[in-house]
């Protein structure tokens, strides 16, 4: 079975690559130094410092593997294609909530870049998935864990 791609903007890929580089060069070295310092204290069988450093190392290596895996499947979003009038990954979408008339603007991104607080929602989220393929003036009903939302698309960029 082929794995699905990780959709990233150019900025998103650059951020993940920078994080990976930092983890591999700076963080690894710091943790190795912590482990070495704990070993110098003597008996490591009951050393809290040693155990903490080894746990930090395991978490770090897990994140490094995760980033490498994400980047190996990266498919860069063509931002020129995002402005076709149809909601796609990379589009910025302004919607109006039918229940109260409020408006919200989101950018549809891949799950690795999603950050709802920054207005970046995943194409795999209920709202993101419901908006994909839609156009201005389309009405969209979204089933979310907190209930049903009715939206009207006002702008697609």
From Swiss-Prot:
InterPro entries: GreA/GreB_C_sf, Tscrpt_elong_fac_GreA, Tscrpt_elong_fac_GreA/B, Tscrpt_elong_fac_GreA/B_C, Tscrpt_elong_fac_GreA/B_fam, Tscrpt_elong_fac_GreA/B_N, Tscrpt_elong_fac_GreA/B_N_sf
Domain of life the protein comes from: Bacteria
One of the protein's GO biological processes: regulation of DNA-templated transcription elongation
Keyword Transmembrane helix: no
Coiled-coil annotated residue ranges, if any: 47-75
Keywords: Coiled coil, DNA-binding, Transcription, Transcription regulation
Role according to the record: Necessary for efficient RNA polymerase transcription elongation past template-encoded arresting sites. The arresting sites in DNA have the property of trapping a certain fraction of elongating RNA polymerases that pass through, resulting in locked ternary complexes. Cleavage of the nascent transcript by cleavage factors such as GreA or GreB allows the resumption of elongation from the new 3'terminus. GreA releases sequences of 2 to 3 nucleotides.
Protein name as catalogued: Transcription elongation factor GreA
Lineage: Bacteria, Bacillati, Chloroflexota, Chloroflexia, Chloroflexales
Gene name of the encoded protein: greA
């Amino acid at each position: 079975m082929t794995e699905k791609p990780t959709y990233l903007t150019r900025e998103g890929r650059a951020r993940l690559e920078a994080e990976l580089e930092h983890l591999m060069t700076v963080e690894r070295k710091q943790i190795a130094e912590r482990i070495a310092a704990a070993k110098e204290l003597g008996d490591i069988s009951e050393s809290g410092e040693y155990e903490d450093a080894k746990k930090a190392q395991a978490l770090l290596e897990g994140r490094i593997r995760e980033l490498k895996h994400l980047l190996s499947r990266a498919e860069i979003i063509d931002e020129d294609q995002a402005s076709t009038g149809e909601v796609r990954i990379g589009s910025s979408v302004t919607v109006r909530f039918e229940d109260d008339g409020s408006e919200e603007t989101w950018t549809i991104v891949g799950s690795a870049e999603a950050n709802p607080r920054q207005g970046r929602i995943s194409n795999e989220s209920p709202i993101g998935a419901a908006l994909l393929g839609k156009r201005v003036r389309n009405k969209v009903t979204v089933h979310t864990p907190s209930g049903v939302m009715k939206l009207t698309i006002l702008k697609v960029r």
